[in-house]
């Protein structure tokens, strides 16, 4: 197994489990998003609320500061959401972003939201609200699956991966232009805004309700392990030269068909993503003397991701049909 295959997943889990690691994960200080043709005048766009009331790993002033900066550059008004969804958390909100709620070591993973909250969000969207729900690898899929189920979305809840040509599992999945449908989120307002590629950095798989558009179709043959130790055990078996088919059958299952979905729900709109890092801009810095170069992931490493994020917001807010 090549050392980089699971680096991102290991770092992300380290933040949840909080062991002492030599390397540091941080927002990339060099990432400064610009938008050539903003959809809205500065500070005049719809209100985008990024949830912070549910032990969210991605926050406005933290891991999602780059995403918030991108949206502000496009004219959106972005703020943190600090209230439960059934107690004021949906007031004066045009777009609700819920990203990796439920960061916890508790086993089994408890729901991040109460039944009353999931019912409130579903009713809000049905009445015209716009939801961007993002939940990636364990434990975030399990924490969010109750909310996802309100919209008919099934979550794999584990670690989705594909096999490389070298026979290694990789959780970094790149979606090229030829994989995409012609949904407005992909095509944008014109040819200059077309999404040419998207890269996901360690997430889960998804299955949508009838009629949902698959924005990011999982690679043919993609699979999912239930948690990081299981995925690591699989990689170790493969590295040791074990029977690949037997190891895959024992330690993984076929992935669900998507890592990104879009659909209407009543008078509202929903986008669900199975990976959150794609819309951030992160830096993994290794200690001096380690002989390892800094690693970037997110919009700073995959330029198509920023266009994808903007087009998602444009579709949710009606800039795109």
Regions found by a protein language model. Give the residues of each.
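Bacterial N-terminal signal peptides that target proteins for export
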Residues: 1-8
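Compositionally biased, low-complexity intrinsically disordered regions
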Residues: 10-11, 15
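N-terminal signal peptide c-region/cleavage motif recognized by signal peptidases
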Residues: 17-19
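Short, surface-exposed patches at the edges or C-terminal ends of soluble domains, predominantly
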Residues: 22-321
